[in-house]
Amino acid sequence: MMKMKMVTALFALSLSATAVFAQKGVEDGSRFGHGQDSLNCLQNISVYTEYVKTNNFKDAFTPWKAVFDEAPLAQVGTYTNGAKILRALIAAEKDGAKQKEYFNLLMKVHDQRIQYLDGLNRLVKSPATKGDIMGAKAHDYFSM
């Protein structure tokens, strides 16, 4: 009976450990998440970065959005490239409702960058200030 309780306890511990290792960065404050989520995050960063380099913003959007949502502390490029992707999508979009959706997401990019500013600034040599980001947000707001 004691052995059965021990096996059950070990099984429960292993399940909880698995859940911890499967967390996304947004859930635990890590840069990339853990386990498979970290691999997915790094793959998405690689994919969207290559698309941005070739100005293929439409295909860059989905992997970029996954990083933006799941690993907000992954890299500053999530925000700088995200703004670039969204500006291009707004300019190319003909549907007013979709433009508004992209515009609102662009404003959220700036807001989320401010939210995670301290953690993001630890990753770079030249840190941004809240004023820098607010200025970029105002520029995007009035130029879109």
Where are these regions (language model features)?
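Basic side chains
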Residues: 3-5, 113, 137
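Mature soluble domains of exported/periplasmic/lumenal proteins and thiol-rich metal-chelating peptides
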Residues: 29-32, 37-50, 61-62, 66, ...
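Internal amphipathic alpha-helical repeat/solenoid segments
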Residues: 58-77
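Amphipathic alpha-helical repeat scaffolds of TPR domains
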Residues: 35-49, 72-92, 119-144
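Bacterial Sec-dependent N-terminal signal peptides
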Residues: 1-31, 83
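A conserved position within tetratricopeptide repeats
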Residues: 32-34, 52, 68-69, 110, ...
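Helix-turn-helix repeat elements of alpha-solenoid scaffolds
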Residues: 23-24, 52-64, 98-115, 144
